Amino acid sequence: MRRGRRRKAMIVLWGCVAALALCAAGALFLLLRTPQPQEVEIPGARGNIPATVQMPGKLARGGEVPLVVLCHGFTGSRLGDGHFEPLAAQLAEQGVATVRLDFAGCGASAEPYTAYTLTNMAADVDSVIAWMREEYGVDGPVGLVGHSMGGRLASLYPQLGTQAVAALALWSPANGTGLQGLEFLNIEDFSQVEAVAAEAEANGQAGTKWGVEISADFVRQMRESDPNAALRACGLPVLLTYSGQDAVLSEATMAGTVSTVQSLPGGTVETGLFAQGDHNYNNADAAVDAQLDADLCRITTEFLTAQLKN
């Protein structure tokens, strides 16, 4: 009789231990698991801003949660040519929150493309940073990732924006001085770029071969901006990448920006990894394309984690 009772007690005990282990494993999984990205509408100065939020898992946070804002390029979207989602996932694993947004006239934005200006983009970044702090309790330092025109915006943001930022990652920024920053509109003939700019300034807007109309405000703000001077003035840590098969930016623009970032105390330049990439860090060969994405996300994650988490 006693043995039977003892055996039943042991069975119950082991059952309780197993149940506790399962509960602990489940709780640990929930703490470690990276939450699913959330599609949101963020209130902005001109209306709602379509965006995607990626928060880190609870255990990955480890105190303050830094934030990185991902800024796409001209006629782009928050997909970031396929690079923003994997980058956001990798940053989340390191305890860094991200928000990627559609600027005016791009992606799911309801605004016309003529609202796509540097000051409007900076205002949108202001709005999403403030909203992330209020809605998600993000309380750590902020970094920006910008591709192409988004890289120009990120370079200028310390001058144009109202929120403090601690680091910049620039992917092939369109950082030519003044109107040279619009060279991608017609890289073969800059006189055509000047003609489009003049038309926009005369008529309020002008069409482009990219299928969108740019505004006089955008042209004026481009003409008056010098992103490399802004980088030198802000003195922030900067990661700069350029690809080897970029067909929309001039060698002069790339060389000037490389020289600027190399002169910064916290400047890092990486071009060798991307010799086979185009302006969007893509390649027709699937294996090469995957490696470009992996390298781009890896070095950006390493840089931002080092700057924002330490």
Question: Whereabouts are the PLM-identified features?
Answer:
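Glycine-rich nucleophile elbow surrounding the catalytic serine of serine-hydrolase chemistry
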Residues: 146-156
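Active-site glycine-rich loops that stabilize anionic/oxyanionic intermediates
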Residues: 65, 72-77
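The alpha/beta-hydrolase serine catalytic core
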Residues: 49, 152, 159-305
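Conserved alpha/beta-hydrolase
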Residues: 88-110
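The serine-hydrolase catalytic nucleophile loop
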Residues: 76-88, 103, 252-253
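Catalytic nucleophile-loop/oxyanion-hole region of alpha/beta-hydrolase
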Residues: 42, 78-80, 106-139, 290-291
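Alpha/beta-hydrolase fold nucleophile elbow
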Residues: 136-148
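N-terminal cap/lid segment of alpha/beta-hydrolase-fold proteins
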Residues: 29-62
